[in-house]
Amino acid sequence: MPRELLALYQNGNYVVKLYSDGTKIKQSIENSFISAFPDSIDLKITNYCDQNCPMCHEKSNENGKHADLDAPFLKTLKKGTELAIGGGNPLSHPSLLPFLRQMKEQGVICNLTINENHLKTYNDLVLRLIHEKLIYGLGISLKTYNKQAVAFAMGYPNTVLHVINGIFTDYDKIANPNVKILILGYKKVGRGITYFNDEISKQMNITKEILPSLFDKFRRISFDNLALKQLDVKSLISLEKYNEIYMGDDGESTMYIDLVNKEFAKSSTSTNRYLLMDDIIPMFKQIQVIH
């Protein structure tokens, strides 16, 4: 199936092309990319979750609250902006559907991250979101091998399996040329502080050792910035390959927004938090990193 161009826009001194398969291309005639607004936002919409994962950096649980999804700044999001929506369990939010419809109407591109165990519980809703094009990318967080999640990823090519460095070990079991994975850095934040142990540290070293052999086993392997650092990916692959997967430092064109606590930051691990404003641009300028 040919990929569709979802968005083409100018952001500061560069042009962004965003395709339906998740490919994002940034082009500039200058040596650096300086954003006028965030082209990607990590958006937390709930702290409710029934999984109680011991490494959860958001400390989500069954007492967690849902956020109000009518914050004024949401209406100021630019067409083509990507939202990586998560929680908690975002599928449990009672206003998820109308919120996604509002974002689609604004031209905002929504992606959703869910826990592997919620794929079965909310399967009909997930399929509805995909078929109605309310979301374009689906991230499924895995702790161990999950047959249903791998099958789903093979059937819906915009699905990415999310695994945490040091936690996930079953790379060979999920390896498939039709599967995309995202390796996330282990966050020593929230419950992740006390859960970290020598076994996790050992597994992080093992993952670093086997990483070069994994690239040919998957359709695509990508990393968040924390994983890039923890695994020292730059030393393991060619500079050309690294430049393909590296999209800039946190805060250059990205930011984190916690709608539950009504605050924003450079990333979800940032200790410097600021209260929400009514417009996305001054919010972004507050945390923006310019090189």
Q: What label would you give each PLM region?
A:
Residues 1-43, 252:
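N-terminal [4Fe-4S]-dependent radical SAM core
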Residues 40, 58-67, 79-93, 103-122, ...:
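Core AdoMet radical
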Residues 52, 87, 260-261:
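Residue-level recognition of short loop/turn positions
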Residues 71-74, 96-100, 126-127, 150-151, ...:
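Generic structural signal for well-ordered alpha-helices
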Residues 121-124, 193:
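Short Asp/Glu-rich motifs
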Residues 133-281:
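Radical SAM enzyme [4Fe-4S]-AdoMet core and its adjacent flexible, acidic
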Residues 285-291:
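Cysteine/selenocysteine-centered motifs that mediate thiol-based redox chemistry or coordinate metal-sulfur cofactors
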